[in-house]
């Protein structure tokens, strides 16, 4: 480690940009403390970790951070939430970082403390909660000697969130959807180039807000076409989606908590994401590469193609299963008893118990449907769904085994339903 380097705290280290920063700075010789809400995977990756939920009131206090920052000389704040409540957004972007910066300034000599805040391009022209709190976060950072670095669209070897959505749109079957006319400008920057810029700016800080983007400007259509070619897929017609339809999809995404499928993301795609590299970025010893250069720097693997094709299956599976549970619940609540009691005749189960079982099961099914549509604890809910399907299957196998022999499948259909639930469980783990 050179004399100029030191120990760096990375906030949001389990995110797409945060992980690239953690690995890149560690490879460059920095001692990295990776901080995130859940640190188990970062622990397994060999990082020193600091578990902290920036949305909690506790993390907004200087006392929480003091004593946890022993030896830390620099901070890189890569934490951010695109869609969240007003309270959570302000806590993550403003209050918790302010406490971190203040605590860091109290640990040793203030003049040796340097840091970078990864911010976002375009927030000056937007009045979304995300943009407002980003601007507030930048003001707090500047007041503590932390340099905001506004990044344009960030792509990388891996993908998450918006970059995953871009790959999914590029790999869409039969057509390639774009928002509006598809002529919006982008100058993507590679995550590895962003990491190199951050490493340099930590030891060569610049004054004021900086911006970083790639040197090549492409339209939305050109960017998705480039990603499609990289994935090895043939050309397809471009489907220009009306903006009103995209906004409606964004509202559905917000309601279902689908991350990058959100109103905020749609607004960004409507306008494009164009960074104007600042003087400090133009003076970097190693300039960022253009989109065409880095997208063709390595071949796409099977995992890239599979991920791109499966990414949009997550909302599809949620909606399909929600419809299944909704219909099942309504049937359980309102199906006349004369329709289902004959199926268990002779089983020894009292009619009142069978009716209660059907009605309570209907309520449970509707609750599961609601949880799916709201995106409430999706992975645990997948376990609940599997348990319910298995429970129904075992119960009906005992009470009415003839259901296995019905011409249209009967209980046999539960087997593919279990497979769909298992697939949803896998897809809900984005990290």
Question: Where would I find each of the regions flagged by the language model?
Answer:
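Conserved Rossmann-fold NAD(P)-dependent oxidoreductase catalytic core, especially the SDR/UDP-sugar
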Residues: 81-82, 91-152, 156
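A conserved pocket-lining segment of Rossmann-fold NAD(P)-dependent short-chain dehydrogenase/reductase
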Residues: 168-189, 193, 197-201, 205, ...
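N-terminal Rossmann NAD(P)H-binding glycine-rich loop of SDR-like oxidoreductase domains
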Residues: 8-28
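Extended, low-polarity transmembrane helix blocks
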Residues: 262-337, 352-367, 373-431
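Conserved glycine-rich Rossmann-like NAD(P)H-binding loop of the short-chain dehydrogenase/reductase
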Residues: 30-37
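NAD(P)H-binding glycine-rich loop region in Rossmannoid oxidoreductase-like domains
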Residues: 40-99, 103, 121-126
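Alpha-helical membrane-targeting segments
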Residues: 164-187, 229-273, 339
